[in-house]
Amino acid sequence: MDSIRPIVVPLEPLTFPLRTAAKEYPQKTAIITPEAGGKEYSYEWLDEKSSAFAASLEDLGVKPRDHIALWLKNSMEYILSFYGILKAGGVVVPVSTHYGRREVLHQLRETEAKGLITSDSLYAPMGNLFSEIKRLRFIVCEGGEETSLGTPAFSSLLEGPKRLDRSIGIDPKETIAVLPFSSGTTGLPKGVMLTHFNLLSCLYQVVQVHEISANDIMINQLPFFHIYGMTVLMGTSVLAGATQVLASRFRPVDEFLSLFETYRPSLFFTVPLIVQEFCHHPKVPTMDWTRLRYVNAGGAILSPEVQERFTQITGVPVMVGYGLTESSPTTHVTPIGRIKKGSIGLPLSLTEDKIVDPETGTTLGPREVGELWVQGPQVMKGYYNDPEATAQTVVNGWLRTGDLAWKDEEGYVFIVDRLKEVIKCKGYQVAPAEIENILVSHPNIQDAAVVGEPHPEYGEVPIAYVVLKDRTTASSEAIIDYAAQGLAKYKRLTRVVFTETIPRSPSGKVLRRLLKSPPRKRSE
C-alpha cells in the first residue's frame, strides 16, 4: 500500500531539511506570524539567521552536546532557536510554556541544562534562576532590543558576522538532537534521548504518508515544545518546503477560525479537543473548507462520532495519527482514503507493530487484546540517565507503548485502554507520581493516589484519592489549591475523593486499577 511503501532516510543531521529548503526554495515564505503583525520569513533568511545564532551561542560558551533549554511559545524565534541550537552542536531541551516554577526548575536540573532561551514574559516571574541552577551559564531573552532582566537580548544574537553549523558531519544515529520530557509508562517525567536520525526518520515517514509538499500551507497551532507540534507540524513543514502559519492559541475560537479564512490552509494537524470545538462552533458550517485536504487528529483518542460529525459539517476527512514522545512521535496513521473509524491506522514506513500478551510476552493474533509494541528508526535511544527505565520500555528494539490494543485482519490497530499510569489531559501527559509527591507533603495528608477520570472534552482529568492523618481535617478545595502551586493548569486536580486506605501491592505500588473503572472491551 502506498502509505507504507519503504522510504530511504538519509544519514544527515536534523538541520539537513532547513539547509535543503534554503537551497531549493530560498525566497519562498517559510513562516508567517499573524500574532507578530503578519511578518513573513523566507527559508534563506531562516537558514542564514540560525547559523548566525549558532555562532553567537558558541561565543556564549556552548560546546557540542551541551543541553540548551528552549522555553518559548510558537514563534519565529522558537524555530530559529531550535535550528540554531542544533547548528551550535547543542541538544534542544523543550520546556512547556504551561510549566510553573517548580516544573521548570525540575526539568533544568534533570536535563543538566547549561543555557536557557526564553522570553521576558516567561522569565520575569521566575526570579533568579542562576542561584537555583548551578550548571546554568547563560539566559537569552526574547522581548526587544533591550531586556529588563540583565540578560542578552535575542535580537543581538542574530546580527554578528560569523556563521556556524557544527551539525554537519556528526553521526546522526548516535548524536542526541532533542531531549524532551516524558512521563514514560510510570513515575516522574524523564528526559527522552531522541537522535538526529530518530527525528529525521519520523519527518520523512510523516511527509510521505500525509503527502506534504512545498505547495502546502499549514496552520501550526499545537505547541512546538510538545513532540507532536515539534515534529509533525514544525519539522515536516521545513522538510517539505511548505509554509507554516504560526499560532500560539486556539481560543477565542472565532479569532482562530479567522486564520483559516485569511490563509486558506491545505493541511491542519491538531488534537481531538479542537476538532470537537469546531464541530460545535456556529461559524464552521458557514466557512469555505474546499482548500483543506484533510485534518489529522492525534495526541489523544478521537471519538468516531466527532470524526464523522466534522466531515459531515465541512466535507473534510479526518485522519488519525498515533505515537509517543519515545517514538519521535508518530508510529501509526490512517491512510488517505482508507479511514476506518475508531482506528489509529497502519504503521508508517519502516515501522513494525505487534500485539503482545503483557503477562506472558506471547504475540497475539487478530482481534486479541494485548499491549501494542512498535519498532522502527524513530524509536528513542533511551531515557536520559535512566538505564533501568530504558530496559523496561525498550525490549530487543521493540518499544512497549503501554497501550492496550487489538488489530483487525487488515492490520488496522484499535486502541482499547492504557496499561501505563500516565494520564492524558488535553493531549498532554500528566504523571500521577508528580502530583502525589506534592499531596503527601501536605501536613494533613497521610497517603494519596492520583488517577485519570474520563472527561468529554479533555480525554482525562486528574483526580486524587486522599487519606487524611488522624485527628486532622482539610477540605477538597484547600487540597486542590495546595496541589496546584507551581503546576501547569492541565495537571491540576479537578476533584478529591477522601478514603480510608489507598490500595497497594505488597511492594507498595499503588493499585490504580482498583481506583478506576475497568477497561472497555474491544468491539468485535
Task: Locate the predicted segments by residue.
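Conserved AMP-binding/adenylate-forming core of the ANL superfamily
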Residues: Q27-S75, I79-Y83, G100-L105, S155-S156
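AMP-binding/adenylate-forming catalytic core of the ANL superfamily
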Residues: Y99, H106, L116-T118, G376, ...
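Conserved AMP-binding/adenylation subdomain of ANL enzymes
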Residues: L200-I217, I227-S266, H281
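Gly/Ser/Thr-rich phosphate-binding loop
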Residues: A242, P265-T270, C279-K340, E352
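Structural core segment of the AMP-binding/adenylate-forming
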Residues: R19, D59-L60, K87-L158, E261, ...
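Conserved AMP-binding A3 loop
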Residues: E40-W45, A177-S201
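Conserved ATP/PPi-binding loop(s) of AMP-dependent carboxylate-activating enzymes
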Residues: L346-L350, T362-T393, V430
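Conserved pre-ATP/AMP-binding loop-to-beta segment of ANL
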Residues: V9, P26-T29, E159-F181, L188, ...
